[in-house]
Amino acid sequence: MYNIIAPLYDKINGELDYSSWADFIEENVRRYGPDMPTELVLDLGCGTGRMTLELARRGYDMTGVDGSAEMLNIARAEAERAGLSKKMLWLLQDLTSFELYGTVELAVSCLDTVNHITTTGELKQFLSLVHNYLVPDGLLLFDINGKRKFEQIYGDSSYVMEEEGAFCVWQNSYDKKSRICEFYITLFQKNEDGRYVRYDELGAERMYTIRSMKKALSDCGFELIGAYSDFKFTEATDDSERIYITARCKK
């Protein structure tokens, strides 16, 4: 679904403090990371590369993986403008079947990317691949939307977003029993001739409990270190709006 909303993606998430988030990532590495320098970092579901670029500015060699060609095109252009292209490798791959050239010391996945993996089987495929490419005791850091986000913010709400040359209508439908929220997206994109073309897309997210995520991590060779509700390492509950997961790769 992110192919059609790529032009609006950064506006949707414009208020996010990527610097503070990167500080939180680095503090996790200081507290829990492997007994070796963290130099190679994997950003899974990197989107337009905002976090990938933030970490590259801090000296890390980054690999960004995403399933949307349009999002990666924006990421490449931003890296070029920032003069960081030499520190980047961009891969157009599915998160449940990606392949890397070697191991990394740290893997991150930001902005509820993992919620888009909607079956337990695919979640374990994803986690097993990350485990395969992490060094022993390497960290996996990701966030998931919690119960409050699904029930009170997503719910059955509708949103309208507008950017120069683009207009988007976003409708949600959340099923508490299946814990699946479906997104119905309609985008009107302005062409060079001034006419608008309509695009329709369907996406979904699944709400995971901390307990179910801990089990999936354990089944795939990870130790859950913590689940936090903010960047101050406050313990999260399933009712938290966003849950930040820190897990260690055991080999």
Give short role names for the model-derived ranges.
Residues 1-36:
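Conserved class I S-adenosyl-L-methionine
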Residues 40-42, 49-97:
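Class I SAM-dependent methyltransferase SAM/SAH-binding core
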Residues 99-106:
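A short acidic, Gly/Pro-enriched loop at the edge of an enzyme's catalytic core
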Residues 110-112:
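Residues lining the SAM
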Residues 115-117:
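A short His-aromatic
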Residues 121, 141-214:
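SAM-dependent methyltransferase
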Residues 124-136:
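A short glycine-rich, Lys/Arg-flanked "PGG" loop and its adjoining helix->strand segment in the class I
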Residues 204-251:
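C-terminal lobe and adjacent flexible extensions of AdoMet/dcAdoMet transferase-like proteins
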